[in-house]
Swiss-Prot record:
Keywords: 4Fe-4S, Iron, Iron-sulfur, Lyase, Metal-binding, S-adenosyl-L-methionine. [4Fe-4S] cluster binds at C16, C20, C23. Consists of two subunits, CofG and CofH. It comes from Methanopyrus kandleri (strain AV19 / DSM 6324 / JCM 9639 / NBRC 100938). Residues 2-248 form the Radical SAM core domain. GO terms for biological process: sulfur compound biosynthetic process; water-soluble vitamin biosynthetic process. Its cofactor is [4Fe-4S] cluster. The keyword Hydrolase does not apply. GO terms for molecular function: 4 iron, 4 sulfur cluster binding; 7,8-didemethyl-8-hydroxy-5-deazariboflavin synthase activity; iron ion binding; transferase activity, transferring alkyl or aryl (other than methyl) groups. It catalyses: 5-amino-5-(4-hydroxybenzyl)-6-(D-ribitylimino)-5,6-dihydrouracil + S-adenosyl-L-methionine = 7,8-didemethyl-8-hydroxy-5-deazariboflavin + 5'-deoxyadenosine + L-methionine + NH4(+) + H(+). This is 7,8-didemethyl-8-hydroxy-5-deazariboflavin synthase. Its EC number is 4.3.1.32. The gene is cofG.
């Protein structure tokens, strides 16, 4: 069985305190009309998602832009918020209360207190480990200008999620200059945390894709064989954790990834594009079904919180009514 979640993607802000060399998502203040999407803009997107049968609202955005840009801080203060996370909590609450949809937030590096607040209104949360390497944070490395990409900062958030019993999505980004040993070490660190807390609901193996205009524009992409070897390795290191491969980044190799050990396609949106990889459109659900069944698997829709964690009751009372309404007896989407 291979799972996926039908979602709507909300790019809350494209300002970010980090400047990763492979990113095409972030913008400078002068490049955007407003530092943040307004509540009206957010819920226009959410409404379209609900009409299309989506159950997940995916909030992905730049990390703590108010620490770097006065424009971001001023916008938040004008709208009655002290931080991006505080604004996000309010939006997540409204997604649940007004739209019967389940948020999944990728807020970047946050404090334990912030995560506790988000947990009240999120079915799950996520933070990629990328590659846990101090070397990549050094001069000329892809994370040189990204304080939020320090390995100890990423691991701290993964630990908080375990302590707070947050169903958590994490993963690795391959092909950004890491060694094979660094790749394996990152997967082993994720497994170590999962063995301790049991909270890692999925691990994404995401391949770097070059894009015009980024500092790593001329950096080679990982080969299909490299991706498949990494998927197989992730399956061996994390035997009990679902492994996800994004289908829009792997149209030619996605089926082979399933045979190598992947068993989840991740979030797929019939409404919004992948703002992180805008050049790579989502496949239609019917195409995804065909790709999955052609190699002998069955496609099944899930919620942003994985079935195991639905069955365990790993969600806050604030969202319990919506989780139970949207899930079946096995914890998958109705």
């Amino acid at each position: 069985m291979v799972s996926y979640s039908k979602n709507v993607f909300v790019p809350l802000t494209r300002l970010c305190r980090n400047r990763c060399a492979y990113c095409t998502f972030r913008r400078e203040p002068e490049e955007v009309r407003s530092p943040y999407l307004s509540p009206e803009e957010v819920f226009e997107i959410v409404e379209k998602g609900k009409e299309a049968g989506c159950k997940e609202v995916l909030f992905t955005f730049g990390e703590r832009p108010e620490e770097r840009y006065d424009e971001a801080l001023e916008w938040l203060e004008e709208h009655g918020y002290s931080s991006t996370v505080e604004y996000l909590v309010d939006l997540c609450r409204r997604c649940v209360e007004e739209y019967d949809m389940l948020p999944h937030s990728n807020p970047g590096v946050i404090t334990k207190r912030e995560m506790r607040k988000l947990r009240r209104w999120n079915a799950s949360m996520g933070l990629m480990m990328e590659i846990l390497s101090e070397r990549l944070c050094e001069e000329s490395g892809p994370h040189e200008h990204s304080p939020g990409k320090r390995p100890e900062e990423r691991l701290k958030v993964l630990k908080y999620a375990g302590e707070l019993k947050v169903p958590f999505t994490t993963g690795i980004l391959i092909g950004i200059g890491e060694t094979w040993e660094e790749r394996v070490k990152t997967l082993e660190e994720i497994q170590r945390m999962h063995e301790r807390y049991g909270h890692v609901q999925e691990v994404i193996v995401q391949n770097f894709r070059t894009k015009p205009g980024i500092p790593m524009e001329d950096h080679p992409e990982p080969t299909p064989a490299d991706l498949l070897r990494t998927v197989a390795t992730a399956r061996l290191i994390l035997p009990d954790v679902p492994v996800q491969v994004p289908p829009n980044l792997n149209r030619e190799t996605g089926q082979l990834a399933l045979l190598a050990g992947a068993n989840d396609w991740g979030g797929v949106s019939p409404v919004t594009k992948d703002y992180v990889n805008p050049e790579a459109p989502w496949p239609e659900i019917e195409e995804l079904k065909r790709l999955t069944e052609d190699v002998g698997f069955r496609l099944r829709e899930r919620l942003p919180i994985y079935p195991e964690y639905v069955r365990r009751g790993w969600y806050h009372a604030n969202i319990s009514e919506v989780v139970e309404r949207l899930s079946d007896d096995e914890g998958f989407a109705r």
